[in-house]
Amino acid sequence: MATTLYTNKVWCVYILRQDNGKLYTGITSNLNRRIKQHSNKQGAKCLRNATNLRLVYHSASAYDYNTAARMEYNLKRKCSKYFKLRLIKAKPLLLHKFLLANKL
């Protein structure tokens, strides 16, 4: 397999909270850089008008791109806000174990 931008890094899943209480879920291979991008209005379009973004959860940087993207998809499409709030409160370092324990 050829080494690419996606395969030669480790990835994490993160959740940001906006002032209005909305949650944003994303993945990155460099959490500090990504948070700065969001803060400088260079990140996701849905966050460009957001102020005071707070990092409320991040997993360990222990996943390949495909695994992190799959977990992000599951959190965005299959999980309620209530589930995400439970995740934030639990703060599991290994997100995949939390998702497996909750049958996701």
Swiss-Prot record:
InterPro entries: GIY-YIG_endonuc, GIY-YIG_endonuc_sf, UPF0213_domain. CDD domains: GIY-YIG_UPF0213. Residues 9-89 form the GIY-YIG domain. Belongs to the UPF0213 family. This is UPF0213 protein in VLF1-GP41 intergenic region. The lineage of its organism: Viruses, Viruses incertae sedis, Naldaviricetes, Lefavirales, Baculoviridae.
